[in-house]
């Protein structure tokens, strides 16, 4: 007999968690044992830690944490998440309810998509009833300690390839692409080294923005001496996009839209702060270039869109997303799907909506990316977050940020703030569009809700009214018992 998922198409883990109950009401743990219940809740919190630190939204993490606890018989749990903390609460016992709480601190953001895919498969296995708690705990221990699916050198090459592809995306030739490749390689290698030494992310972004600027100005001066023509703005913008790609703007807007304003505000402020570090680093690089008399050329006005290099830009868009996925340690199936999604999104952007302006075009194209990527991710059982973030990476406004910073430092304040505002609006449009597209894909592929175990949830709730009614019933039984014994006498 064909299953519902086979008839309708494959669904994502979070869709299955929202729609389907655990396979059986028989709990694999002793629900009256405080330690076993707390162990299951701690297991669910650790899974939520990996989801949150990988960039999963607040609401989706709650659903999947609750799915894990329900699969082990804890149908009544409250899950509260605020940015870097997870709190889970439940009651155990029959007549005497005993509260159980688990509090877990979430680690910092770590874009390791291989762990996200592994924990996604673990949740599916738990929800299907195929993994008991002790096996799930062992798998989770191995997952937390195991390295990525491939080493850091491969990821570093992915980031470097992404920088070169973004340069082509911005209209640069092979010389510009090669310099952007080397610049991105240097940025990620340096910031990763500083991160291991404990330097805060803000200062890492300052260093990254500085590295993105100074080599471009030196390369421009050398190119003039040899009679070559390059645009340093394309090199700098590609470095900015590499730094912007790992930020959490998409997740912050998704949290705000789905009803988690505290987490959304914190993530949005964090994104603005880290973006400010990039801008500060670019500004330092521009000023140092002037001090060293390695002058950058005046900014040209933004060129009107044309079809002369559309094919190259579409290909570069797909390569950018695939390279970003490699840089985030995604599995190869995820890399391929992310590249195909960005390829279709770039084609849609440059062939149909580029003339609508940067903000509107970004919003429409991101919606198409979120929708297409959401369907493909569900078809191939990949977390939709990976495809969504990678799919909009080619459209990040690195060039607008550089234009704004350059104009501001050259006494063109109005033009500078205008470009910064356009960059912020474009980034917000990308995030909002991809969230909307993924929501549409979820609505099309989501199975109907089915929850036959509501009575279990009701049974675990403590009610003063029920307690009072039980006491009244006990008191009514006592005199009847005494009277019956009196008649026997």
Curated annotation (Swiss-Prot):
Regulation: Transport is inhibited by the proton ionophore carbonyl cyanide m-chlorophenylhydrazone (CCCP).
Keyword Heme applies: no
Knockout or disruption consequences: Mutant shows increased threonine peptide sensitivity. Mutant still exports L-threonine, but at a reduced rate.
Subcellular location: Cell membrane
Gene Ontology biological-process entries: amino acid transport; succinate transport
PANTHER family associated with the record: SUCCINATE TRANSPORTER SUBUNIT YJJP-RELATED, UPF0442 PROTEIN YJJB-RELATED
Protein name per UniProt: Threonine/serine exporter
Lineage: Bacteria, Bacillati, Actinomycetota, Actinomycetes, Mycobacteriales
The encoding gene: thrE
